[in-house]
Design a protein with these regions (language model features):
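Acidic helix N-cap motif at the loop->helix transition within catalytic regions
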Residues: 14-18, 42-50
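Short, acidic, metal-binding catalytic loop of nucleotide-sugar glycosyltransferases
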Residues: 21-30
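N-proximal low-complexity "stem/linker" segments adjacent to membrane-targeting elements
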Residues: 1-22
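Conserved donor nucleotide-binding strand/loop of the catalytic core
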Residues: 31-34, 45-78
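Cell-envelope/extracellular polymer assembly enzymes that use nucleotide-activated donors
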Residues: 2-4, 32, 180
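Acceptor/aglycone-binding surface of glycosyltransferases and processive sugar-polymer synthases
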Residues: 64-78, 83, 95-175, 200-212, ...
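A conserved acidic beta->alpha catalytic loop
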Residues: 37-46, 91
Length: 229
């Protein structure tokens, strides 16, 4: 099986080329790389046009910033290979974890694999207490409605069989994608596995974008997508 690596980015000029190089160098099967620039204003789009466009499977440009969910929607639609994996453009997740992430799919045990930043033995950067508590609360609430036992619903690393992710309509434009896709996967009764990975988190000074407003939106999305008929 081959990989489609989807890289949504917004104002990631400082790290994007390193991420692309890391994805290319990572162990694992043949892959295509699809980058979606979501209306960046820091020169990311110019960087892509000058140094990247034409060297990857696809580079997609959004004229205005719409959010991570919108960027992923564009990327998923463009994917052509059997396994689709999300790679954030900020170096918080290490492409060296690809083999572990996709192995349950290769073994025909899973249709979807979530990573977990809170299980396993890989390095994990120590950061914000309240961010961790909020993540735990959102995962707990999501699990209550989905009847799953995930340890890290809000994680950015997810791998899918292509036919699974392309069959699901993604409605959320921002970080509400995580609880939305979790609810829809649970309703679809897909086989979901979880794998512990390394996590090299950023501070807000280093460019981390998710905030408390996204947390409240996540609660709304948990209710919306689990309770809606």
């Amino acid at each position: 099986m081959r990989l489609s690596v989807i890289i949504p980015c917004y104002n990631e000029a400082a790290s994007l080329l390193r991420v692309i190089d890391s994805v290319r160098a990572a162990p694992g099967p043949e892959r295509e790389i699809i980058v979606i620039d979501d209306g960046s204003t820091d020169g990311t789009a110019d960087l892509l046009r000058e140094q990247v466009d034409g060297k990857l499977a696809r580079v997609i440009y959004h004229e205005r910033n719409q959010g991570k969910g919108a960027a992923l929607r564009s990327g998923f639609a463009a994917a052509r290979h059997e396994i689709v994996i999300v790679q954030d453009a900020d170096l918080e997740y290490d492409p060296a974890d690809y083999p572990a992430m996709i192995q349950p799919i290769l073994d025909d045990q899973a249709d979807v694999v979530f990573d977990s930043r809170f299980m396993g033995h890989r390095p994990h950067r120590v950061l914000y207490f309240w961010h961790r508590m909020g993540n735990g609360l959102l995962t707990f609430l999501s699990n209550m409605f989905t009847n799953l036992n995930l340890t890290d619903m809000e994680t950015g690393y997810k791998a899918f069989r292509r036919e699974v992710i392309q069959s699901i309509e993604i409605e959320e434009n921002r970080f509400g994608f995580e609880p939305e896709i979790t609810a829809k996967l649970a309703r679809g009764r897909y086989r979901i596995y979880e794998v512990g990975i390394g996590y090299f988190g950023r501070t807000y000074q280093e460019g981390k974008k998710i905030g408390w407003r996204d947390g409240f939106r996540a609660i709304w999305c948990i209710l919306k997508y689990n309770l809606r008929p």
